[in-house]
Amino acid sequence: MFYRFCRSLFRFFFGVFCGWEVFGAENLPQKGPVLVIANHFSYWDPVVVGSALGRQVHFMAKSNLFSYPVLGFLISKLGAFPVDRRRIDRTSLKRALSLLDEGKVVCIFPEGTRSKTGTLLPPLPGAAFLVRKAGVSVCPVALQRKKRIFGNNLFPCYHVHVGATFSVNKPGRRDLQADADLMMAKIKELLEDSI
């Protein structure tokens, strides 16, 4: 209920003040576990992805965000869970796998951090590890910054492109980085197709 209320509120905000557009939202399966992957260039990205999709999305969020009482409470209520990016966070990975096992949608930003220039960064292998362990399909989301409101980067405007789901669980594949690169290539392909 709280998640749906917040999603409606942000959809209204992005629609009225940002002129955002969402393409291909129907590509996200309406049932079953899915790992959503997206490029990352703004603090707004999780809010935008969560607002664009028709199901509740659980995000890995950097652990220090939970140290702020109000923010930590809000993002926890919205289904986010902490990840320590300085190390392999087994607790966070187990939480993501548990959510996927329950048939939920989990989103991860394969780059592991925001790209300050907006260009795609090399992916880390975490998303590929989750897919391999959970055996779930992947839904790529490409975020495009279209313009800025109020002449600054506080409220970036987006085009959101949701691609068709795909699988990376090929028999005999053992290279996580190769799978991570494949996943990032899907995001890049969406961005290139939208130009």
Positions of predicted regions on the chain:
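Short, Lys/Arg-enriched, disordered terminal segments
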Residues: 1-4, 193-195
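Catalytic core of membrane glycerolipid acyltransferases/transacylases, capturing the structured
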Residues: 2, 6, 15, 28-87, ...
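Short gly/ser/thr-rich secondary-structure transition/capping motifs
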Residues: 15-23, 87, 142-144
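Secondary-structure boundary/capping positions in well-ordered alpha/beta enzyme cores
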Residues: 20, 55-56, 81, 103, ...
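Residues at the C-termini of beta-strands that transition into short coil/loop
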Residues: 26, 63, 84, 142, ...
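A short beta-turn/loop motif at secondary-structure boundaries
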Residues: 26-28, 153
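Non-catalytic C-terminal accessory region of glycerolipid acyltransferases
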Residues: 91-195
